[in-house]
Amino acid sequence: MRFEIRRLHDEFRITTVYVTHDQGEAMVTSDRIAVMNAGRIEQIDEPFALYNRPRTRFVAGFIGRTNFIEARREANSVSFDGFAVPAGRFNGELDGRTGAVTFSVRPQNISLHGSQPAGTDGLALPGKIVERAYLGEFWDYVVAPADSALRLRVVAPPREVFEAGQNVWIGLAPEQMTALA
């Protein structure tokens, strides 16, 4: 049905307002989406931008699954629970911001490795698999970075099998982490 609605929209080239609670349907059928919270518009954007660059915690949590990671912006770095990253790695998202900041990072934008990745341009942290669930198309993992109270959701292809309790390396790419308002 999603593709038929989109086809009709494109064929007749008309403006339509379509109200739905089905996120997948909204992403397929829309040129722009308005996300509302308690009767107030939180963000209006194209589906790709809304999903990949949400502006607020509400929008990030409403559209798809995400991990919220609390941090503190200092002069030249961003300090997380157990690790720090140079502020310049965040593509200018933090320009002019200091103090507490919350990041959103989608589960599919975190990678898992059985050994420390070599030559990675991202950030690699030691961690441990806390839980896992096989869902056919992918593994759904809960991982804990070492020396941190964080728990991160990570989805990985079915061929990437890690056991609960196994030590792993967690790959984060700062450019895939969105600073929220």
Which residues does each PLM region occupy?
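ABC ATPase nucleotide-binding domains
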Residues: 1-58
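A short, hydrophobic beta-strand micro-motif
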Residues: 35, 100-105, 164-172
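Residue-level signal for well-ordered, solvent-exposed loop/turn and beta-edge residues enriched
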Residues: 40, 72, 128, 150, ...
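Residue-level recognition of beta-strand microenvironments
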Residues: 44, 74-76, 132
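ATPase nucleotide-binding modules
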Residues: 55-103, 107-128, 137, 142-161
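Short, Lys/Arg- and Gly-enriched loop/turn segments at beta-strand edges
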Residues: 110-114, 175-181
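A short, acidic, flexible beta-alpha connecting loop/helix-capping segment that sits on the rim
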Residues: 157-160, 173-177
